[in-house]
Regions:
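Charge-dense, extended regions
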Residues: 162-317
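Hydrophobic repeat-domain scaffold segments
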Residues: 1-181, 210
Length: 317
């Protein structure tokens, strides 16, 4: 699967087969990916997350969910970005592809590509054959999609932890050249926060990859049964993103309840992922001003310029 051409062929084939041999082969491939890594645990922070969590919370509070009138513009910008890299028409710009041939020396990148494709392939099977797969097969596929994504995510977290010292040193060196006399402690703090923002964004993208692969309304019961029972916080995040950003549902109260529950047990990092899920939903979905304001207040998002001007506007006869 890590060879791009073969991966694309297998994705295509999985549009047309639910053969148990194919499913078993893909699941077996998934189980060896990141086999040395544990699944990412949202209750156990890495050193980088521990050192920057307060700054991350402050950063994501600054996100603006905009107004209902901004939704179309936001979607248009998304399409332009997808067009620019060739995603929308099925091609991919040469600069945005990675060499995943057998000669590639970067085995870790090959494994990441393999993991992403494996999730996509399992998603193709379960979406196309929802009615023909029995409950056990669906549960097995969903569980392995979740497991490989969390092992991959844990691998990223470990890598970011190892990389942070080198990155901070680089930032300090560059800042000293550009801004002599600047406090190194402040530079180091900002550099770590920037790195953690990148990690948190990557974290959400991995959650979204799984929810996108499971994006079929009739899969909701199987997803609920499998992810809520065995997958802890990460399963709840996938379910929330699946409903809000893939299936067009509006479980705003469910999102607020999860955010409050995580905040009460001081799981600030997982709460930030909920905040990102809701931010993405609010930016891409037409909702009433009442619901948008409810989201803004519950998640402490900054007021939009639209609402500020609207409240200051004098009444007309």
């Amino acid at each position: 699967i890590y060879v791009e051409a073969y991966g694309n062929i297998l994705i295509f084939v999985c549009h047309f087969t639910n053969d148990r041999r194919v499913i078993n082969a893909v699941i077996s491939n998934a189980k060896v990916l990141f086999a040395e890594d544990d699944e990412f645990d949202y209750t156990k922070y890495t050193k980088l997350i521990n050192e920057t969590i307060a700054g991350i919370d402050s950063t994501f509070k600054q996100l603006d969910i905009g107004s209902d009138g901004d939704v179309s513009d936001y979607k248009a910008r998304e399409l332009k970005i997808k067009d620019s890299i060739g995603e929308s028409d099925g091609s991919v710009d040469e600069d945005s592809t990675m060499d995943m041939t057998e000669e590639s020396t970067d085995q870790r990148m090959s494994e990441i590509s393999n993991g992403i494709r494996t999730i996509d392939i399992l998603g193709q099977i379960i979406r196309n054959y929802t009615g023909k797969l029995n409950a056990q097969a669906k549960s097995e596929i969903i569980s392995e999609m979740h497991s490989v994504s969390m092992r991959m995510l844990n691998s990223w977290n470990v890598a970011f932890d190892l990389f942070q010292s080198e990155f901070v040193e680089f930032c300090i060196e560059q800042a000293e050249k550009e801004f002599p006399g600047k406090a190194t402690e402040q530079i180091a703090k900002r550099a770590k926060e920037f790195l953690c923002v990148m990690l948190t964004t990557a974290n959400y993208s991995q959650i979204h990859n799984v929810s996108l692969a499971l994006s079929k309304e009739t899969l909701i019961p199987a997803c609920e049964e499998t992810l809520r029972k065995n997958s802890g916080i990460s399963g709840k995040l996938i379910l929330l993103d699946l409903k809000m950003n893939c299936l067009g549902r509006q479980p705003v109260d469910e999102a607020i309840d999860l955010f409050i529950a995580l905040s009460k047990v001081n799981n600030i990092y997982a709460a930030q992922i909920v905040r990102l899920i809701v931010w993405q939903f609010a930016r891409r979905t037409h909702i009433s001003h009442v619901v948008r304001d409810k989201i803004r207040q519950a998640f402490n998002f900054i007021p939009s310029a639209f609402l500020q001007s609207d409240t200051n506007e004098p009444e007309t006869a």
